[in-house]
Amino acid sequence: MVWPRLVLAACLLAMPPAAAECLSQCSLCAVRTQDGPKPINPLICSLECQETLLPSEEWERCQGILSFFPSALRLRDQSGLDSRAALEEVYGELAKRARPFLQELEKSRFLPSTPAEDKFRGLLGGLGEGLGSEAMGAPQLNSGAVEAAALDFDEDPKEQVKRYGGFLRKYPKRSSEVAREGDRDGDNAGHEDLYKRYGGFLRRIRPKLKWDNQKRYGGFLRRQFKVVTRSQEDPNAYSEEFFDV
């Protein structure tokens, strides 16, 4: 029940005085012709009176009917002062009654004065702020990466080893590089550290050829390292040495 009253009040408040006069005259014509064969439609008559619709047949009929009633002519000739005063009183009462409802609706944002574009505009504004923050964050990340790279470049290699757990490619260096540098500089400390750290798997070191290993592994050393054992030596060589003595 609240919405129809609000709509009626809004229509009456937004209606100009000329439209009110047209509506009153057309309503009077409709009342006079309601029992006739062709009653006048007050809505069409009022629109034709305001020159909104063409042709103005209903309005012409209404003017012809009003010409037969002196009261209507007198009201029209006097510019409808009394009717305007009455209409103003009605409009004032309606405005007073409708003002609280309109204020409540404005507070709760139910009126069409707040379209959905405001919502989309807010979403677009949020997206724009997000994109701006991302655009500002990208240079910061890039600058942070550059600073980290500069610190890593200026940092001591041993500190980098402690920091990254020894999984760098440039430090510690490979065994071949360390061996070449040790031969040129005469410093084998780095190679020894690597040998102790990785358990001798950086370079191939042949085991010492001992007879204990020969006894232990059998003929493996003879085949692998071409070791000549006493069993393979010529026994005549020992006999010749004995005769010479």
Swiss-Prot record:
Annotated InterPro entries: Opioid_neupept, Proenkphlin_B
GO cellular component, as recorded: axon terminus; dendrite; extracellular region; hippocampal mossy fiber to CA3 synapse; neuronal cell body; neuronal dense core vesicle; plasma membrane
Signal peptide span: 1-20
Any one GO molecular-function label of the UniProt entry: opioid receptor binding
Subcellular location: Secreted
Listed PANTHER family: PROENKEPHALIN, PROENKEPHALIN-B
Record's protein name: Proenkephalin-B
Organism, as annotated: Cavia porcellus (Guinea pig)
Gene that encodes the chain: PDYN
